[in-house]
From Swiss-Prot:
Superkingdom of the organism of origin: Bacteria
Protein name: Putative regulatory protein LA_2599
Organism: Leptospira interrogans serogroup Icterohaemorrhagiae serovar Lai (strain 56601)
Pfam families: RemA-like
Family recorded in the similarity comment: Belongs to the RemA family.
Disulfide bridge partners, by residue number: none
């Protein structure tokens, strides 16, 4: 049985690490532009549970996944293979 490396992008949502092309900050002008394009193309996936979008994950299928986790946090999770849920980043209030 093969084992897939996954990334918890918040609130129990996961993405296969092998499918990630890049992770970008959500507040840049170019990020907002590609976000709007993805929304109009029906290729936008919102994994924020209504929280502020802090990063955008671009996949090899040209889907964009919105995450409430910071780029740095997602990068650390990939590097350390840690997919635990940090309560300070996922405040459910």
């Amino acid at each position: 049985m093969s084992q897939f490396s996954v990334l918890n992008v918040g609130f129990g949502n996961i993405v296969l690490v092998s499918k990630i092309v890049s992770i970008i900050h959500s507040d840049s002008a170019s990020a907002k532009r590609i976000r709007n394009e993805a929304k109009s193309n029906n290729s936008l996936i919102d994994a924020t549970q209504g929280k502020k979008t802090r990063s955008i994950i671009v996949t090899d299928s040209n889907h964009l996944i919105l995450s409430n986790l910071r780029v740095e946090s997602l990068t650390k999770r990939i590097e350390s293979r840690d997919n635990s849920i940090a309560s300070e980043e996922e405040d459910l209030d």
